[in-house]
Amino acid sequence: MMEQSLIPQTPVLPLTAQRTVKRALTLLDRHLRETGVAFTSTQAARDWLKLKMAGLEREEFMMLYLNQQNQLIAHETLFAGSISSTEVHPREVVKRALYFNAAAVILAHNHPSGDTTPSQADKTITQRLVQALQLVDIRVPDHLIVGGRQIYSFAEHGLL
C-alpha cells in the first residue's frame, strides 16, 4: 500500500498542531477499522478526509475501500499530481479495488486552491470510474473533493 505523509510540513501549522492532527487521524483511523463501524453516511469519510487532505500542497487522488457492510478495509493515495491537476487511470483504480476485494469505494481528491467546484475533467473521470467499477460489481457511494475546510459531494449533487 502506498504511504503518504499524514501532515504536510507547512509554515501555517505549528509543529504541535501537526502532532495533534496526526494523533487525531490515528485515532479516527483506528475507530473506523473497528468491527461494526460502518460508513452509513459519508460524514465520517468527510471528517477524516478533511483532516487528511486539507493541507496538501498538490492534488492527490485517494480511495477508501469498503467491504459489503460499508466498513473501511483500507485507504491509499493512488495518484499525485501538480498544484492544479492529477492524472487518474481507471485501470489502476479497478485493479486496486479488486486487490482489496472491495464491495464499494469512496473516491476522493483535493483541490489545493480551496475551490471545491468540480471541473469538467473531474466530472468526466468520475463517470468513467463509476462505469469501470460497475463492470466488476463495485459500488461508488460518493466522490468527494476536499478544498480547505469545504467538501463537495458528487452524490449530493446528483452526479453519480
Swiss-Prot record:
<feature type="binding site">
    <location>
        <position position="109"/>
    </location>
    <ligand>
        <name>Zn(2+)</name>
    </ligand>
</feature>
<keyword id="KW-0378">Hydrolase</keyword>
<dbReference type="GO" id="GO:0008237">
    <property type="term" value="F:metallopeptidase activity"/>
</dbReference>
<dbReference type="InterPro" id="IPR025657">
    <property type="entry name" value="RadC_JAB"/>
</dbReference>
<dbReference type="Pfam" id="PF04002">
    <property type="entry name" value="RadC"/>
</dbReference>
<keyword id="KW-0862">Zinc</keyword>
<keyword id="KW-0645">Protease</keyword>
<feature type="binding site">
    <location>
        <position position="122"/>
    </location>
    <ligand>
        <name>Zn(2+)</name>
    </ligand>
</feature>
<dbReference type="GO" id="GO:1990451">
    <property type="term" value="P:cellular stress response to acidic pH"/>
</dbReference>
<dbReference type="InterPro" id="IPR020891">
    <property type="entry name" value="UPF0758_CS"/>
</dbReference>
<dbReference type="InterPro" id="IPR037518">
    <property type="entry name" value="MPN"/>
</dbReference>
<dbReference type="GO" id="GO:0034614">
    <property type="term" value="P:cellular response to reactive oxygen species"/>
</dbReference>
<dbReference type="GO" id="GO:0034605">
    <property type="term" value="P:cellular response to heat"/>
</dbReference>
<feature type="binding site">
    <location>
        <position position="111"/>
    </location>
    <ligand>
        <name>Zn(2+)</name>
    </ligand>
</feature>
<feature type="domain" description="MPN">
    <location>
        <begin position="38"/>
        <end position="160"/>
    </location>
</feature>
<dbReference type="InterPro" id="IPR001405">
    <property type="entry name" value="UPF0758"/>
</dbReference>
<protein>
    <recommendedName>
        <fullName>UPF0758 protein YfjY</fullName>
    </recommendedName>
</protein>
<dbReference type="GO" id="GO:0006508">
    <property type="term" value="P:proteolysis"/>
</dbReference>
<keyword id="KW-0479">Metal-binding</keyword>
<comment type="similarity">
    <text>Belongs to the UPF0758 family.</text>
</comment>
<feature type="short sequence motif" description="JAMM motif">
    <location>
        <begin position="109"/>
        <end position="122"/>
    </location>
</feature>
<dbReference type="GO" id="GO:0046872">
    <property type="term" value="F:metal ion binding"/>
</dbReference>
<keyword id="KW-0482">Metalloprotease</keyword>
